[in-house]
Swiss-Prot record:
Origin: domain of life: Eukaryota
Similarity annotation: Belongs to the eukaryotic ribosomal protein eS26 family.
Region (Disordered): 93-112
GO terms (BP aspect): translation
Gene: rps26
Key words, A-Z: Ribonucleoprotein, Ribosomal protein
Record Gene3D superfamilies: Ribosomal protein S26e
GO cellular component: cytosolic small ribosomal subunit; extracellular matrix
Name of the protein in its database record: Small ribosomal subunit protein eS26
Record organism: Dictyostelium discoideum (Social amoeba)
Any Pfam family: Ribosomal_S26e
GO molecular function, one term: structural constituent of ribosome
Alphabetized InterPro entries for the sequence: Ribosomal_eS26, Ribosomal_eS26_CS, Ribosomal_eS26_sf
């Protein structure tokens, strides 16, 4: 039978079984190695409100940083595709195993 992907859509290589996790979006049971995982760091206070709060004088201490939320989201393949976290690639593009470039993230340059 033909195979669609070299790793069969999983990163289990050599393990007999892996634990299941629940999708963040739909609560479907998904093998942990197959789930699409994303780690989000978001500020609790949005940027528009930071200036207003700082102007009030409550948190105008030099170097004060507002707290941020740290959330690890795990999605099943269906929800990841539906919410555009991952995209369907053509047959030729599926063979490319390098990680796609992330927009807005600069590569570290070598120090001279």
């Amino acid at each position: 039978m033909t195979q669609k992907r070299r790793n069969h859509g999983r990163s289990k290589h050599g393990r007999g079984s892996v634990p299941y996790i629940r999708c963040t979006n739909c609560a479907r049971c998904v093998p942990k190695d197959k789930a699409v995982k994303r780690f989000y760091i978001r500020p609790i206070v949005e940027n528009a409100a930071v200036k207003d709060i700082s102007d009030q004088g409550v948190f105008n201490v030099k170097g004060y940083k507002f707290p941020r939320t740290y959330v690890k989201s795990q999605y099943c393949i269906s929800c990841a595709i539906h919410s555009h976290i991952v995209r369907v690639r053509s047959v030729a593009d599926r063979k490319i195993r390098t990680r796609p470039s992330r927009p807005g993230v600069k590569k570290p340059t070598a120090a001279k």
